[in-house]
A protein has these predicted regions:
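Thiamine diphosphate
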Residues: 1-69, 87
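Flexible, low-complexity linker and terminal segments
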Residues: 77-175
């Protein structure tokens, strides 16, 4: 894609189209909530970063196949050249994205929201950002701001969760 900025680009990420003289670090769009707001029957986020995440991935693909109508699966696809990390670290970068809650794993099934992976011990956003060269220009204060935005977004998603949703399929958790 040419490593160009999009509405889904994380806050503070370097891209080939990011202005360098006066960078503007807008927050990324919440694609899952946008899609769910359009009444799509099944919306989910997926990533491959650990065995529990693989089980979550499979369950969501299976569920999407069962749902009638339009389904939307937002799959995290790390990009070594664009994100500036070694290719052999792709699974680790995906794991850090999820475990830092920067890329929450969730689903909205016919309007019922559920966080499907809750890290028992979330890693600081700085670990996810530090694994990639595209965030190397950020100051400690900017990283703290991103951490607060990630925390606020997680809290918003947790508040959207439907009562009793954990009874349907328990959220997995990293040990």
């Amino acid at each position: 894609t040419g490593v160009q900025k999009s509405g889904a680009t994380p806050e503070g990420a370097w891209t080939t189209t990011t202005p360098t003289a006066a960078p503007r670090h807008g927050q990324k769009k919440d694609i899952a909530r946008i899609m769910a707001a359009h009444g799509i029957p099944y919306v989910a986020t997926l990533a491959l970063g650990s065995v529990p995440m693989l089980k979550d991935f499979r369950a969501k693909v299976t569920r999407a196949a069962e749902v009638q109508g339009f389904r939307f699966l937002h799959i995290l696809g790390p990009c070594p050249p664009g994100w500036r990390y070694p290719t052999d670290q792709s699974v680790e970068v995906a794991r850090l994205a999820v475990e830092s809650r920067t890329f929450p794993l969730l689903e909205c099934d016919h309007g019922e929201w559920k966080l499907t992976f809750r890290p028992k011990h979330p890693v600081p956003v700085s670990e996810f950002l530090g694994a990639q060269g595209r965030f190397g220009h950020l100051s400690a204060a900017e990283i703290e701001t991103i951490q607060s935005h990630v925390d606020a977004h997680w809290d918003l998603l947790a508040a959207l969760e439907s009562p009793g949703s954990s009874a349907d399929r328990p959220a997995t958790a990293q040990a």
